[in-house]
Curated annotation (Swiss-Prot):
The active site is at 309. It comes from Rubrobacter xylanophilus (strain DSM 9941 / JCM 11954 / NBRC 16129 / PRD-1). Zn(2+) 1 binds at residues 66, 68, 158, 309. This is Dihydroorotase. Substrate binds at residues 68-70, 100, 282, 313, 327-328.
């Protein structure tokens, strides 16, 4: 991320409805920013500059624990500038980049190089997840202590999953000794042989499916090993009701957290009937019964966070038959609106819980983010909850356009994003004024 020292002059953001569960804030007030940090919260504080945010909602900046910015290796699909621009447009102020790049982020020099590039090129705070094992091949563990020294926030097997329980157990033990959390993609590839969820929709559409057990078996194994090793483990993109229940069972038995995605909580496997490669994703979209179980687990805090699994793809990788298309969706720019429209407005999730899952919780996970309490980094998202908009290729800042929400009308749109006191995304027009 480029220099984010913020302006030395105080900026008062006036009249927004502030929602910050970490600080117990839920009401109209002012937030004063100075030197890149939150200086004060409360009405009537004087400041040299003012931002009229009346009618808007203000949240701690969203933090995404799971994204693919395709750097290095596939900058034609996404790079640090475009990925961070998409993140900023979606209200994200912090993003964790996954290691399944080309080359894989399995060596200290690659990690430190990407950390330095991100400091220069990213509009938001970008964190690096290094590979759990060399080449993400599931065999030889990486030098995790050296990866941590190079700047890795965590290690992960995302993209392929670790197929050997022995390797996974040893990896957890090593990660624990190195002081690194582990983000796990739970998938048994001996079961995951289809392109979509194995169920009634796949059968009717005539498309080979992958059973839910491909995720559930791997999730159960990961949780058992997490409890045994004491490693700090995060299960990503939970998509089945049983996997969510397993996470709940191990709460208190293991140092485990978990996330689900916007698409697994707002879409279902009925999209298979489109027979469109755009809708292929891994883990696959599930039936309504799984979606309801996952949404309930998110509502109840069993699933801690929402992460997007932002996965850009070139058109030629998605404009294929469903079975041949590359799996993955864009996520940054539509995440909040999809969840607000599909869950909050439908009465299935409170706004406060959504902010906790997108901002406060993942901000604590990465450390020191996700709060508007005085002294915290001035990372925030301003949102117009009343604005309706249609997702289109024209509205997307990403280099790619593989969003499952293309053509859908959503409500709630980010209009401003601040990182370290600096506006990195601004659709507010002439709301900024100077006091005399």
């Amino acid at each position: 991320m480029s220099t984010r020292s913020g302006s030395a002059a105080e900026l008062a953001i006036r009249g927004a409805h502030v929602v910050d569960p970490s600080s117990g804030l839920d009401g109209v007030t002012d937030v004063v920013v100075r030197g890149g940090r939150v200086a004060a919260v409360g009405r009537g504080r004087p400041a040299a500059r003012e931002l009229d945010a009346s009618g808007l909602f203000l949240f701690p900046g969203f933090v995404d624990l799971h994204a693919h910015w395709r750097t290095p290796g596939r900058e034609d699909e996404e790079d640090l500038e475009s990925g961070s621009s998409a993140a900023a447009a979606g209200g994200f102020t912090g993003v964790v980049m996954m290691p399944n790049t080309d080359p894989v982020l399995d060596r200290p020099a690659l990690v430190s190089g990407l950390v330095r590039r991100a400091e220069r090129e990213s509009r938001v705070r970008a964190f690096v997840a290094a590979a759990l094992h060399a080449g993400l091949a599931g065999e030889r563990l990486t030098e995790m202590r050296l990866l941590k020294e190079a700047g890795a926030l965590c290690v992960s097997d995302d993209g392929l999953g670790t197929q050997s329980a022995g390797v996974l157990r040893n990896g957890m033990l090593y990660a624990r000794s190195a002081g690194l959390p582990v983000i796990l993609h739970c998938e048994d590839r001996t079961l995951a042989t289809g392109a979509v969820h194995e169920g009634a929709a796949a059968a009717l559409a005539g498309v080979p499916g992958t059973p839910a057990s491909a995720e559930d078996v791997a999730t159960a194994a990961a949780l058992v090993l997490a409890a045994e090793t004491g490693a700090r483990v995060h299960i990503t993109h939970v998509s089945t009701a049983l996997s969510a229940a397993l996470v709940g069972f191990f709460r208190g038995r293991a140092a485990v957290t978990a996330d689900t995605t916007p698409h697994h909580t707002t879409l279902t496997d009925e999209l298979v009937f489109a027979l469109d490669g755009l809708f292929r994703v891994n883990p696959p979209l599930r039936p309504g019964s799984d979606r309801e179980g996952v949404v309930g687990a998110l509502r109840d805090g069993i699933l801690d966070f929402v992460a997007t699994d932002h996965a850009p793809h070139a058109p030629e990788e998605k404009e294929l038959p469903l079975e041949e298309a590359a799996p993955g969706f864009l996520g940054h720019e539509t995440a909040f609106a999809a969840l607000y429209t599909g869950l909050v407005l439908e009465g299935r999730l409170s706004l406060g819980r959504l902010v906790e899952a997108m901002s406060c919780g993942p901000g604590r996970w990465v450390g020191g983010l996700g709060s508007l309490s005085p002294g915290s980094p001035a990372d925030l998202a301003l949102v117009d909850l009343g604005e309706e908009w249609t997702v289109s290729r024209r509205t997307l800042a990403s280099r790619s356009s593989n969003s499952p929400y293309l053509g859908r009308r959503l409500r709630g749109r980010v209009v401003g994003t601040m990182v370290g006191g600096e506006m990195v995304y601004d659709r507010m027009g002439a709301r900024l004024g100077v006091r005399t």
